[in-house]
Design a protein with these regions (language model features):
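Transmembrane signal-anchor hairpin modules in multi-pass inner-membrane enzymes, especially those
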Residues: 1-98, 121, 131-134, 141, ...
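A membrane-periplasm/extracellular boundary helix in multi-pass inner-membrane enzymes
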Residues: 215, 236-282, 297-305, 313
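Hydrophobic core segments of transmembrane alpha-helices in multi-pass, intramembrane catalytic enzymes
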Residues: 57-68, 112-124, 173-190, 206, ...
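Long extracytoplasmic/lumenal interhelical loops at the membrane interface
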Residues: 283-294, 305, 309-351
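Transmembrane alpha-helices of multi-pass inner-membrane enzymes
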Residues: 65-66, 362, 387-440
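Transmembrane alpha-helical segments and their membrane-water interfaces
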Residues: 68-78, 97-150, 175-188
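Hydrophobic transmembrane alpha-helices and their immediate junctions
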Residues: 351-393
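Alpha-helical transmembrane segments of multi-pass inner-membrane proteins
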Residues: 45-47, 134-162, 170-237, 260, ...
């Protein structure tokens, strides 16, 4: 009986159809592993390449886009969109549609669609990511690599080349903003993972990225540090007691106070305070901060006169000139300011109330989704959601003093990580079944 059973089992294993099925299954798993691993490597490399290699981030995303299109074309699995994802896609579509309508209405240059189109172009990457078994380490180590890259290039530029402000491969303002954002994302990972060695690396990434931002002398980006630290205290990832959170608040206050003793920071902060005081007490707009505040005033005036649709992209300079000629703003603005230095005011004056709402929703909708999911998730998803919340809070803060979505690198970075976190942490739990059943 045992001999017969052994013969039957042997024949079953060696049956041609069974062998073919096993080989096909192995090849399928190998293909899936290769595609997912390649995608993970590209996601890992993306932040560092974005910061230190000309067009490096764009090339990494282009390869990821091509990989996504290949997998989506071969995949037969279905993973229905949930309400969170539908709302995200709706907001992205509305944002682009408003940009397109603004282009048509005011006959603006086609280049105004540049950054808005990136949200649409990266959608295949999102649909690909939501079906993968991508490991958390590719995302977290990628953030760390970006933070280290910021420090390396900032130190090289400041101390070896002797440039006044570290800027990476872009303007110092977006560079400083991305640096502090990467640093805060490292900190959020450090506080939500369990690995002791991982925590040390992530804390190091936080410090290095903060140094890079300091070397950029970008004051608006520095505001993200206290906002990020307070956000982390409110998220309470380690479930600290009230006493522990009070102690954490005091430590945060101490860190910020000690930061002020750094001469470079002290000089920039003191200059900011003096500029603001001069603007409001002496009506002196002939300073760096004074001109920015006067620009905000011009944007509010322009919006009040065109509240629904705005003035259109490319018409800001002519509006400044008209306001200066009527003595409603400082005449110096007409020749010295290129943009509004505030993403939300920029959306208001260029695209009106509709543009402002769509811009706000690009930040606030993912923020609300991530926070709602964060309260009920655990493990890797909770780590990713904490990263997403910090990303958005830091981005909102830097957007208060700069035209956030006018910068290619910031737009690519924000869109990529929003899609990554949605795809990995906000899809339905049934995604695991769909991913296992996917075939090519």
């Amino acid at each position: 009986m045992q001999v017969e059973l052994k013969i039957i089992m042997t024949n079953k294993i060696l049956h041609p159809e069974t062998v073919f099925s096993n080989v096909a299954s192995f090849i399928h798993r190998l293909k899936t592993f290769q595609i997912d691993t390649t995608a993970g490597v590209l996601i890992f490399l993306f932040p560092a390449l974005l910061m230190v290699v000309p067009d490096g981030g764009a090339i990494a995303l282009l390869l990821l886009l091509l990989l996504s299109l290949v997998k989506l074309a071969r995949s037969k699995s279905q993973l229905p969109l949930n309400s969170n994802e539908i709302w995200l896609l709706a907001i992205v579509s509305i944002y682009f549609t408003i940009e397109l309508f603004n282009l048509w209405l005011f006959e603006s240059d086609i280049s105004v669609l540049d950054n808005a189109s990136r949200f649409l172009l990266l959608l295949p990457v999102y649909f690909f990511i939501r079906k993968t078994n991508l490991s958390l380490k590719y995302v977290t180590l990628g953030i760390l690599s970006g933070a280290i890259a910021c420090f390396v290039i900032a130190s090289y530029q400041k101390f070896y080349l002797g440039v006044p402000r570290a800027h990476g491969l872009q303007n110092p303002v977006p560079f400083g903003g991305l640096s502090i954002t990467l640093g805060l994302m490292c900190l959020s990972v450090a506080l939500t993972i369990e690995s002791r060695q991982g925590k040390i690396w992530m804390y190091s990434g936080f410090l290095l990225a903060c140094i890079a931002s300091i070397l950029s002398e970008t004051r608006g980006a520095w505001l993200a540090l206290p906002i990020g630290l307070v956000t982390i205290l409110l998220l309470n990832p380690k479930r600290w007691s009230i006493k522990a959170r009070i102690a954490g608040s005091l430590v945060t206050l101490l860190i910020l106070t000690l930061s002020y003793t750094i001469p470079l920071i002290q000089h920039r902060v003191d200059a900011t305070i003096l500029n603001v005081a001069a603007y409001f007490t002496e009506a002196n707009a002939n300073t760096s901060i004074g001109l920015r505040l006067e620009t905000w005033k011009a944007a509010i005036i322009g919006f009040s006169e065109n509240p629904m649709l705005g003035i259109g992209e490319g018409n800001f300079q002519s509006t400044l000139k008209q306001l200066a000629e009527s003595d409603r703003i400082n005449p110096l603005l007409a020749t010295s300011i290129a943009h509004v230095h505030n993403e939300f005011l920029s959306a208001m004056i260029h695209k009106g109330g509709l543009g402002l709402i769509s811009t706000l929703l690009l930040f606030l909708l993912p923020l609300a989704t991530f926070y709602r999911q964060y309260k009920s998730q655990h493990g890797e998803r909770k780590v990713l959601l904490a990263v997403g919340i910090i990303l958005i809070m830091s981005s909102i803060t830097t957007a208060l003093s700069d035209v956030f979505f006018d910068h290619h690198k910031q737009t690519l970075f924000y869109a990529t990580y929003i899609y990554l976190i949605y795809g990995l942490a906000c899809t339905d739990i049934q995604k695991n079944t769909a991913k296992q059943n996917s075939s090519y």
